[in-house]
């Protein structure tokens, strides 16, 4: 389903008060990851903005404007602008600040296994990554982060948001294709896979953000 249509339908549920807290948080984080840079640009270059409506309507797409207005109204236009103009704008922290996501400063989790296949491969191969982790105290809103460091020290990776992960064993899978590009040449040598589980955003300086567990694994591209 088109992401904009999905946001519209979810927003209707939110307004009608039938959305769970986890669904509300996902709505906010999806919106912030997609629209944060545009909102920052509007906040910096949009002139005098005196209301949440004036800010959010500049997004130009009704579902995005609706989610923006819900978040902005929770803290007021001045509070929302402060969040957008922070030195380290953080989608999860913003969603927590506008009360659309929860946090748990006692969250606890341990990575139990990280695998990559193949352990030694060629340029052009697809590398599959797997991670298992044990949550022993609920992760309210956090991330799985994987990062690959090449032999020259350049990095690439992705994150996946975790919402309301109650104590249990969890797993996730990722992949990347080692196809050279302007961003990553994939030189031959030893690479390091870095895996982190976090409450909040991994590496964020904001409150309620910290690394719960990390693990490293080396692999080779020939």
Curated annotation (Swiss-Prot):
It is found in: Secreted. Its main location: secreted. Residues 1-20 form the signal peptide. Keywords: Disulfide bond, Glycoprotein, Secreted, Signal. This is Countin-3. Coiled coil: none annotated. GO terms for biological process: sterol transport. Disulfide bonds join 25-101, 28-95, 56-68. PROSITE patterns: SAP_B (PS50015). GO terms for molecular function: sterol binding. Residues 21-105 form the Saposin B-type domain. It comes from Dictyostelium discoideum. May control the size of the multicellular structure. Glycans are attached at residues 108, 134, 218. Transmembrane segments: none annotated. Belongs to the countin family.
């Amino acid at each position: 389903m088109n992401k904009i249509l999905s946001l519209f339908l979810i927003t209707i549920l939110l307004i009608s008060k039938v959305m769970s807290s986890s669904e509300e948080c996902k709505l906010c984080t999806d919106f912030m990851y997609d629209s944060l840079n545009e909102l920052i640009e509007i906040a910096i270059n949009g002139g005098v903005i005196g209301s949440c409506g004036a800010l959010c309507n500049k997004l130009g797409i009704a579902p995005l404007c609706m989610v923006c207005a819900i978040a902005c109204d929770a803290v007021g236009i001045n509070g929302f602008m402060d969040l957008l103009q922070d030195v380290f704008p953080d989608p999860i922290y913003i969603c927590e600040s506008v009360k659309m996501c929860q946090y748990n400063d006692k969250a606890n989790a341990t990575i139990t296994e990280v695998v990559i296949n193949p352990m030694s491969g060629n340029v052009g191969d697809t590398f599959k990554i797997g991670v298992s982790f044990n949550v022993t105290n609920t992760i309210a809103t956090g991330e799985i982060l994987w990062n690959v460091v090449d032999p020259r020290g350049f990095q690439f990776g992705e994150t996946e948001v975790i919402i309301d992960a109650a104590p249990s064993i969890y797993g996730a899978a990722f992949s990347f294709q080692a196809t050279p590009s302007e961003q990553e040449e994939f030189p031959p040598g030893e690479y390091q896979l870095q895996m982190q589980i976090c409450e909040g955003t991994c590496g964020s300086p904001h409150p309620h953000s910290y690394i719960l567990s990390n693990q490293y694994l080396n692999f080779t591209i020939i």
